[in-house]
A protein has these predicted regions:
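N-terminal [4Fe-4S]-dependent radical SAM core
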Residues: 2-59, 64-119
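Hydrophobic faces of well-ordered beta-strands that scaffold small-molecule active sites
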Residues: 39-41, 118-120, 151-153, 177-181, ...
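Distinct, well-ordered alpha-helical segments
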Residues: 132-140, 161-170, 194, 233
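Acidic (Asp/Glu)-rich catalytic clusters
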Residues: 109-111, 139-146, 166-176, 208-212
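Core AdoMet radical
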Residues: 68-105, 109-132, 147-160, 176-202, ...
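Conserved C-terminal portion of the radical SAM core fold
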Residues: 201-260, 276-299
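Auxiliary Fe-S-binding modules of radical SAM enzymes
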Residues: 2-40, 71-72, 247, 254-334
Length: 334
């Protein structure tokens, strides 16, 4: 639940009128009475159905997965898992990779922050796009690690099944289980334009089914998609809220090298969102969040040479600062 902040350095606003945005950190602190740290995991062999040709080829026009998942850059996959095989020949390697990544990150967080509780975040590519036995082995292994309170699983709605939901529902009886769906937009013409390979009806169907199992859902929204107006972005936000998602992540669309979007940008067919419009749209969204819905991310960026545009996405800390300041003017503390 959103609580009243007792600490605010603003001299021009009544402290008692400042509301705290329910960040994920605050959500976990309220529930577990101490901070919970996400440990991002990138398992080699996973891919996406719009990369391998199942629903499309080439992937989303904006996606160069390494750029969105830094953990993957040092762990280039040497094999690709066929999601339709009965037996996964790479499972032992994947389980070992999971263990090595988790404990390396856990130790770093313990040393730096004194971390005591963790949630394992299956981040890169589509983390339900694999044989069910593989998913069961990976998720069960992750939950067996000391001090792990749950899982967060990044995936697509077209890669969810009733059988996977059965398993996750069973896990959720004892653990905190989150499913993170890449919604991006509820406009089918936009989803077609970015080669998403999924449609709004299917997205809504599986979010609804996931919620019916009592599982937590985090929706990822991208602001600044091709030809989308602020009205369209806010409509996507409102539709996500209507689906009763538990949390949201906001991302600006930026152009990185080696993507289909790069070609559109260089031909003048795509104009990136301005920082001012992005900040304004995120602030308008957060202002209209119902109580109890958390915000896991307000922006994203990339600081290396692969970023082509917009250049304001190079400095994520600057973006967050501007969003914080804009929210504070609206009586909200992020």
């Amino acid at each position: 639940m959103v609580t009243i902040s007792l600490q605010n350095n603003s001299s021009f606003m009544d402290k008692n009128k400042i509301k705290e945005v329910l960040t994920m950190g605050r959500y976990f602190k309220n529930k577990f009475k101490e901070k919970v740290y996400k440990t991002p995991i990138s398992i080699s062999g996973f891919t996406c159905p719009n990369i391998d040709g199942t629903v499309a080829k080439g992937g989303c026009t904006f996606c160069e997965n390494d750029s969105f998942s830094p953990n993957l850059q040092e762990r280039k996959p040497s094999f690709k898992l066929n999601p339709r095989v009965e037996k996964n020949p790479f499972l032992d390697k994947q389980l070992k990779q999971l263990e090595m990544q988790f404990f390396a990150t856990k130790q770093r967080l313990e040393n730096k922050f004194g971390a005591k509780k963790f949630i394992v975040y299956f981040q890169s590519f589509t983390n339900t796009y694999a044989p069910l036995d593989t998913l069961k082995a990976l998720y069960t292994k992750a939950l067996s690690f000391d001090d792990v309170i749950g899982l967060s699983i990044g995936t697509r709605t077209d890669c969810m099944t009733d059988e996977i939901l059965d398993f996750l529902e069973d896990l959720s009886k004892d653990k905190e289980i989150w499913v993170e769906y890449g919604i991006q937009s509820f406009y089918d013409k936009t989803l077609d334009r970015i080669n998403r390979g999924d449609d709004s009806a299917n997205i809504k169907k599986w979010i609804t089914k996931t919620k019916q199992r009592g599982l937590k859902v985090c929706g990822h929204l991208i602001y600044g998609l091709p030809d989308e107006t602020q009205e369209m972005m806010l409509d996507t936000f409102n539709q996500a809220i209507d689906l009763k998602v538990d949390s949201l992540k906001f991302h600006p669309l930026y152009v990185v090298k080696n993507t289909l979007l790069t070609k559109e940008y260089k031909r003048g067919q795509f104009i990136p969102i301005t920082e001012q419009l992005y900040v304004d749209t995120v602030v308008k969204s957060i202002k209209n969040l119902p109580d109890g819905i958390s915000v896991q991310r307000v922006t994203a960026g990339i600081e290396d040479s692969t970023l082509l545009a917009p250049l304001w996405c190079k400095n994520k800390h600057s973006q967050i600062k501007k969003i914080r300041e804009a929210l504070l003017k609206e009586g909200l503390k992020y």
